[in-house]
Each structure stands twice: as C-alpha cells, then as structure tokens.
C-alpha cells in the first residue's frame, strides 16, 4: 500500500500499485540500475537512466507526469528520488522492493 514518509520527498508504492498507475497512463518509469541489470530484465516500458547520471540527465525527467523510480530493491531508486526532488520535481514515487519485488509478485519484465 502507498506509504508517504514526511521525511522523504517521495511516496513508496508496491509493484501492484505501480502496475495500476502504468495501466492508467500518464507516468514515466525510470530504471536506475546499471546497464547489465537493466538488460537482464526491467519493468516494461521503463526508461534507463543509471542512478549516477540522474542529476546530469534531469532534463529528461517529466515535469508534468508522475515519475516512478525503480532499481533492484528500492535503495538506489530512493536516492534517485532525492536527486529529482533536489531538481525541483515533486510527483515522485519509489517502487518498494524494486525489480525483485516486481518479479516476485508475478509481473512481467522485458529485455
């Protein structure tokens, strides 16, 4: 279930909540893992912006859509949310448990 910690500039979502948001449209999904991790399987439609490039590539982040960050377990994506917030973005979400939880819940990945 969605969880917003007032100390964090993002909302934590379960993989199922993310899938629902994606089905409704109007979201940008960003996978912040390394190239080899992304190539081994990622959330369908996710754009690839490695966490160490998020600040430099902030102009690629949507200012008019919800942005969902995902990594392997949710730590690097939380850092990416922090970077996006520092760039002035506010509609930020982190996939709780990352791609591992996405797969564990039975959602498909693409390669």
Regions from the PLM with identified roles:
Residues 1-28, 35-66, 75-111:
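Rhodanese-like catalytic fold shared by cysteine-dependent sulfurtransferases
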Residues 70:
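Short, surface-exposed ligand- or partner-binding patches at beta-edge/loop junctions that are enriched
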């Amino acid at each position: 279930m969605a969880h917003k910690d007032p100390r964090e500039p993002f909302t934590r979502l379960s993989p199922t909540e993310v899938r629902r948001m994606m089905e409704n449209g109007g979201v940008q999904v960003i996978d912040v893992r390394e190239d080899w991790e992304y190539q081994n399987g990622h959330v369908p439609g996710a754009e690839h912006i490695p966490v160490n490039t998020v600040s430099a590539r902030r102009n690629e982040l949507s200012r008019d859509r919800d942005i969902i960050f995902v990594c392997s377990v949710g730590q690097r994506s939380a850092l990416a949310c922090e970077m996006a917030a520092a760039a002035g973005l506010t509609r930020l979400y982190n996939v709780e448990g990352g791609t591992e939880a996405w797969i564990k819940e039975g959602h498909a990945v693409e390669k």
